[in-house]
Every structure is written in C-alpha cells, then in structure tokens.
Amino acid sequence: MGNMDGKAVEELSATECHQWYKKFMTECPSGQLTLYEFKQFFGLKNLSPSANKYVEQMFETFDFNKDGYIDFMEYVAALSLVLKGKVDQKLRWYFKLYDVDGNGCIDRGELLNIIKAIRAINRCNEAMTAEEFTNMVFDKIDINGDGELSLEEFMEGVQKDEVLLDILTRSLDLTHIVKLIQNDGKNPHAPEEAEEAAQ
C-alpha cells in the first residue's frame, strides 16, 4: 500500500483512530479480517446474491495487498478514503469497485448490478430506478459510445456533472458504518430493518 497508509492515518484524529482500532481489535483479535468477518463486522447478513457479490467486490478493493485479509492499516486507509478522501481519490475507488471483472472498463451490466446491490444494502430511496440511473450515466459520460466507461471517461464525466457526482456520493454513503463503529458495534438499525434491506 505504500504511502497510502501514512497519509490515511495522518488525516484521522487520534480519537477516530482509537475508536476504529478498538472496534477492529474487538471484532477481529487476530488483526486480520476475513470476508466472513467483514460481513459480520458491518452487520451484513442474509444478503441477496447481487448484494453479496457487491460486498465481496468491496472487500477485494479494500484488501490492498491482495492477501485475502483486511489488516488494520488497510481498514483505516479504506475508511479514510471513503469518509475523508478527495473527490478524485473516491472516484478512482468507485471505478475500481464498479469494474467487477477488472478489465479496466465499466460496462452497463457491471454498473447496473453494483447500483442495485448498493441500494439493497443502503436502502437508498432514489426517485430514479437503477436502470434509469445506469442509462443516465452512460448517456452523459460514455463519450465514444462504445458501451463501456474507461477510467478517464468516468473521472472526467462524473467530475463535470454535479448531479451525477451527488448521486454517486450518496449511494456510497457509509455514515451508517461510522455510527456502528462509534456505537461499539451496536447497530443503530433494528434487526427487521436490516433484513428488509437484504431483500
């Protein structure tokens, strides 16, 4: 991960770091979070297949050294990126998250599946359907019309479009995860709400 570790940690307050470390070590005494523990950590249970695939993809993007675990530094770097990262850093991460097959481009199917999964987990109440949102993204930023978004098209297109940037940012809002950490793992949502979100 290189410089990302130090930079991420420096941007956090001592209190935040302490809360995150306490939560991490309480839930994961080994210091290495597996995919299963990752799901438990954030209260992600009974997920639909598409939501489960999204969580796996998120885990893989947070596992910076690709060893199959998220250690504390990866955890801090990931949360810092998502919560405090600059727009271009977040957009690069979103792109990596959406590019499920890792081919360097996002196609309509990848974006649609991820948006559906995110909405299932976050219970987003957007007026636009996932299909309408996907079509809007491609209509606005697929410059060459090839049905795929390159990193450049994605970065430039989203940064130029405030509406698109706002919707993407809200869809990946992880404040519920921060509340979970601050509440020492006590989920602020009732269990029946979590089950509803999984369907």
Swiss-Prot record:
Modified residues (Deamidated asparagine): N3
Tissue-wise expression: Retina, in rod and cone outer segments, and pineal gland.
Residues annotated as signal peptide: none
Keyword line: Calcium, Lipoprotein, Metal-binding, Myristate, Repeat, Sensory transduction, Vision
Pfam families: EF-hand_1, EF-hand_7
The EF-hand domain, residue ranges: 13-48, 50-85, 86-121, 129-164
Classification via PROSITE patterns: EF_HAND_1, EF_HAND_2
Lipid-attached positions, N-myristoyl glycine: G2
Binding annotation for Ca(2+) 1: D63, N65, D67, Y69, E74
Binding-site residues, Ca(2+) 3: D142, N144, D146, E148, E153
Residue sites binding Ca(2+) 2 per the record: D99, D101, N103, C105, E110
Gene Ontology molecular functions: calcium ion binding; calcium sensitive guanylate cyclase activator activity; guanylate cyclase regulator activity
GO (cellular component) term, any one: photoreceptor inner segment
GO biological process, one term: cellular response to calcium ion
Presence of keyword Repeat: yes
General function of this protein: Stimulates retinal guanylyl cyclase when free calcium ions concentration is low and inhibits guanylyl cyclase when free calcium ions concentration is elevated. This Ca(2+)-sensitive regulation of retinal guanylyl cyclase is a key event in recovery of the dark state of rod photoreceptors following light exposure.
Domain notes from UniProt: Binds three calcium ions (via EF-hands 2, 3 and 4) when calcium levels are high. Binds Mg(2+) when calcium levels are low.
Protein name listed in UniProt: Guanylyl cyclase-activating protein 1
Organism: Gallus gallus (Chicken)
Lineage, highest ranks first: Eukaryota, Metazoa, Chordata, Craniata, Vertebrata
